[in-house]
């Protein structure tokens, strides 16, 4: 249940991934940065698996979209201050900052940026699709834009769609069972179980690992929390950019970005 591409890229052929992968989300967010008219970006990421993997994809994709990376700064998971890195960013001619992290340090980075007077638009990915991020950053998160799955706001699918029915039913049953709304990690776990059950139904009696993998690779059009999954021998994530949406934090809550 991780968004790094290393999950399926390094451990194939027996590992499948339900979160929106970096190879899916990074170009989606970079395109949004370009569409906003920016051509020079600063990248700040953590040195954990999600951040390191994301930066690899960012460096591959940014030039293809005509985006120049004018700063590339990192911090370690657990760091309580990112001022030094942001000071370097402030000294560049960056027009936007792409923050790639999944930890609480993302909120710290935004607070540090506002304290330093880094008056640049900040962008991110699925690592910020958590209420803890918006709450932790407080007013510093105002205007932050990030890309992640449409299911963060089920109504994005349209209330008469199968996707909306699946996601809203999952959310209702989760709240009834646990007394709180599900986060994205609960949704990814739900997808893993759904996909496994679907594949087991097609894998024959008493399937071994190879038979189960083969069945998973033939998964087609299974609707889950993350979107519509269609696996193949070359794609163990199975999602597309049609399953994504762009959000903006406004008043401490996320709304669809205009």
Predicted regions located by residue number:
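Extracellular/periplasmic periplasmic-binding protein-like sensory domains
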Residues: 113-190, 254-256
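Periplasmic-binding protein-like
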Residues: 40-45, 93-103, 109, 120-125, ...
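Second-shell loop/turn segments in exported
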Residues: 13-19, 48, 155-161, 178-183, ...
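Sec-exported extracytoplasmic/periplasmic mature domains
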Residues: 34-39, 59-67, 87-94, 111-118, ...
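Extracytoplasmic ligand/sensor domains, especially the bilobed periplasmic-binding protein
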Residues: 1-73, 121-149
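Hydrophobic alpha-helical segments within soluble ligand-binding/sensing domains
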Residues: 18-40, 81-83, 106, 161-168, ...
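Segments of small-molecule ligand-sensing domains
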Residues: 173-186, 197-253
């Amino acid at each position: 249940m991780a968004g790094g591409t290393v999950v399926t890229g390094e451990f194939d052929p027996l590992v499948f991934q339900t979160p929106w992968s970096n190879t899916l989300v990074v170009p989606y967010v970079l395109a949004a940065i370009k569409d906003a008219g920016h051509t020079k970006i600063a990248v700040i990421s953590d040195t954990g698996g999600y951040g390191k993997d994301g930066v690899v994809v960012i460096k591959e994709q940014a030039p293809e979209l005509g985006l120049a990376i004018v700063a590339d700064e990192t911090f370690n998971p657990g760091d309580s201050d990112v001022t030094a890195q942001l000071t370097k960013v402030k000294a560049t001619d960056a027009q936007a900052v792409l923050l790639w992290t999944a930890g609480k340090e993302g909120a710290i980075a935004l607070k540090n940026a506002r304290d330093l007077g880094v008056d640049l638009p900040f962008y991110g990915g699925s690592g910020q699709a958590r209420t803890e991020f918006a709450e932790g950053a407080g007013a510093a998160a105002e205007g932050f834009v990030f890309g992640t799955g449409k299911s963060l706001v089920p109504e994005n699918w349209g209330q008469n769609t199968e996707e909306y029915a699946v996601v809203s039913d999952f959310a209702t049953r989760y709240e009834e069972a646990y007394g709180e709304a599900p986060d994205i990690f609960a949704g990814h776990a739900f997808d893993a179980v759904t996909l496994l059950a679907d594949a087991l139904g097609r894998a024959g009696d008493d399937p071994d690992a190879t038979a189960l993998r083969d069945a998973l690779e033939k998964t087609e059009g299974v609707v889950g929390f993350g979107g519509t999954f269609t696996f193949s021998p070359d794609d163990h994530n199975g999602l597309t950019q049609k399953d994504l949406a762009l959000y903006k934090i406004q008043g401490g809550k996320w709304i669809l970005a205009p």
